[in-house]
Every structure is written in C-alpha cells, then in structure tokens.
Amino acid sequence: MELRAYTVLDALQPQLVAFLQTVSTGFMPMEQQASVLVEIAPGIAVNQLTDAALKATRCQPGLQIVERAYGLIEMHDDDQGQVRAAGDAMLAHLGAREADRLAPRVVSSQIITGIDGHQSQLINRMRHGDMIQAGQTLYILEVHPAGYAALAANEAEKAAPIKLLEVVTFGAFGRLWLGGGEAEIAEAARAAEGALAGLSGRDNRG
C-alpha cells in the first residue's frame, strides 16, 4: 500500500463543512471540528484504514471513497487529539510515517476576473457549494495528490471572505473552485497555495 496524501485540518471552516455535509456519504462533520484526510493506493485498501481508525478512536468517518486507482478516507471529531490518533492508527496499519506522504504539487492555478454570465451558469450547474455571479472573479486550483484540495479549501476560507463553489478530493487530481471579489480571491489563492507549499513529503515533481 502507498501513502499518497495525509493532512490534518485543525478547524473545519463553515463553508467547507457545509460542502462536506452536502457530499458526505457517512457521518457529517460540524464546524470547527478537526479532520484528517488520508489518500492511499490501491483504493480498495481504504476499508482497512477505516477499520483501524474506528477501533482505535471515537472519530467518525465522513467520507470513504474507493475509485479506480486511489482511495480516500476523512475522519473527524471535536478533539484534535482523537483525530491525530486516528491518523496514527491508519499510518501504523500502512507501516508508514507522515513523512512518507507525497508532497503537494500544484498542477495548475487560474484566476479569471469579470466572469461572463454564460460561464457562471456552467459553473453553477456543476457545483455542490455556493454560486458565482456574473462579474465576479473565479479561482481554479488543481493539485496532486487529490486529497490536498481539502487543505487548500480550508485555508483559503480562513484567509478571505470568498465563496466555496466546489472541491474534488479524489481522483487523479484534486480541484478547488472559488468565487468572489478580485482582491479577496487573490488573498485566498495565496493562502491556499501557501498551505500546500508548506507541507513536506516525498518528492512529487511529476
């Protein structure tokens, strides 16, 4: 088994929580809870990680995703210590350390100002979060591995009053869509990409 992404979110932000509550297949997280996200390969092995974490802690699983190549598990609790213990249990099952994760790699980063109303319609039809209006600024981030998109979203929301449109935390790449004012989006983008740059891990230059 390969550890791809590993990250602990210290305090889930309101929009990210609302988004996760929309797409959650398990137990819904609440605002300000701590969360751990672990992405591995092969995907089917994520069932074993869920088992290890649940038997070691009182954390609840919000997401357990098994797709073609990779698997993702999200677990949360009010107590950050419990969340870190759940992460430790999953790492122990993998025979891995946090340092064995892949370092995040930003694949693409785009800011589009003054978005046209036709494009805002396209985005609003596919999003699970807030909506973007014509004339606002759109930010799109693509990151590898996919699980790190949640960290980018959480830190962006901490930094600026933006709209969280969509987050994809599984698959070949993670993706984040934000909307809002131009200055606010610029600040959120800096925070998101800065958080990713601050995570250590195995070389991931692609």
Swiss-Prot record:
Use of this protein: Artificial BMCs can be made in E.coli by expressing (Hoch_5815, Hoch_5812, Hoch_3341, Hoch_5816, Hoch_4425, Hoch_4426, Hoch_5814) or (BMC-H (Hoch_5815), BMC-P (Hoch_5814), and 3 BMC-T (Hoch_5812, Hoch_5816, Hoch_3341)). Cargo proteins can be targeted to this BMC.
Against InterPro entries, the record matches this protein to: BMC_CP, BMC_dom, CcmK-like_sf
Q: Where is this motif: Pore gating residues?
A: 67-68
Organism, by scientific name, is Haliangium ochraceum (strain DSM 14365 / JCM 11303 / SMP-2)
Every copy of the BMC circularly permuted domain together lies at 2-104, 105-206
Q: What is the lineage of its organism?
A: Bacteria, Pseudomonadati, Myxococcota, Polyangia, Haliangiales
Q: Which residues form a coiled coil?
A: none
Which effects follow disruption of this gene?
A: Not required for efficient BMC formation; when deleted from an artificial operon (Hoch_5815, Hoch_5812, Hoch_3341, Hoch_5816, Hoch_4425, Hoch_4426, Hoch_5814) being expressed in E.coli, a 2-fold decrease in BMC formation is seen.
- Domains (record comment): These proteins have 2 BMC domains which evolve independently of each other, giving the term pseudohexamer to the trimerized subunit. Although the homotrimer fills the approximate space of a BMC hexamer protein, the BMC-T trimers are more compact. Their universal presence in BMCs indicates their structural importance. The homohexamers form pores of at least 5 Angstroms in diameter; in the stacked homohexamer both pores are closed. In the BMC the inner pore is fully or partially closed while the outer pore is closed.
Name this protein carries in UniProt = Bacterial microcompartment protein trimer-3
